[in-house]
Structure formats: structure tokens, C-alpha cells
């Protein structure tokens, strides 16, 4: 008898419970997030050195966790296409998945017709203005959005 055959009986392993119980899966995801959040602490401390008006995306979870992407252009593309500014090489990512746009001093993420959608803080969005610490999910990649110092041209004249 193979391991595959033995799963047909009443034997319930933890792996089966994790895969079939959504409540446990939600708890499991929260547990997974805790150690991953610790990995972004170094990135947060490096934010002070960012150019004014720019931002940083840090891959918190996914095939290239720990990677950092500087957002310093009016539009930054993300997707599985090799010409994307942020190349996310995984089948869960559309070739042209999302864009990060800087408009009026604020960054927003815009889904550009992806198959699996774009999420901000686990909520599906077509577009959303990003705040410091927001989590953007593109396919299986989770990226933390970190802002640099604001460029303050108004009211700073002495």
C-alpha cells in the first residue's frame, strides 16, 4: 500500500487539516506573517536614505523575498514580462500586472487587467492610493510599501 492509498482512510494528518480548514489556514497565515514582518525592519531603517518623493517596495513573501525595488519614476510597471520595471517571475503574475504611479505627491497602485488581481492589505483593488506600510499582493508576491521623506515645497520658505 502506498502513502497515497493510506490517505483514503480515517487517518487525518496535520497537513490535511491545514489544507481543508479555512479557519486554521487564516491563523496559519497570520503566524507566517509574524516572522516575515521582522525581515522588513532593516528596510524600514534604510528608508531615511531614500530620495525625497520616492518610495521602496520590499518583497516580504515570494520567490525573491528580501528584494527591494525603488519607486522613483512617474510610472513603474510590475509583471512577468521581462521588460517590466519590477520583474516578478511566477505563473501567478500576469505579464503586465500592475503599475505604481506617482501623482500629486502620492503613490498609487493600479491593476492593469491582471488575471489574478492586485490586493492592498488583502483587499482586491483596481487602484488604490498607498500609505506607508501597506502590503501589496501581486500573484504570490507580497510587497511592503515604504515611503521616503516627503518633498515639501510649500510653506518651507523662511
Swiss-Prot record:
How is it modified post-translationally? Phosphorylated on Thr-21 by PknB. Phosphorylated on Thr-20 by PknG. Phosphorylation at either Thr-20 or Thr-21 prevents binding to target enzymes.
Asked whether the keyword Phosphoprotein is assigned, the reply is yes
**One Pfam family named in its UniProt record:** FHA
Phosphothreonine carried by residues: 20-21
Task: Note the PROSITE patterns from the entry.
Answer: FHA_DOMAIN
Domain FHA, which positions? 76-125
List UniProt keywords, sorted A-Z: Phosphoprotein
- Describe the subunit structure: Monomer. Binds via its FHA domain to Kgd, Gdh, and the N-terminal region of PknG.
Q: What does this protein do?
A: Involved in regulation of glutamate metabolism. Acts as a phosphorylation-dependent molecular switch that modulates the activities of Kgd and Gdh.
From the Swiss-Prot or TrEMBL record, give the protein name.
Answer: Glycogen accumulation regulator GarA
User: Which species expresses this protein natively?
Assistant: Mycolicibacterium smegmatis (strain ATCC 700084 / mc(2)155)
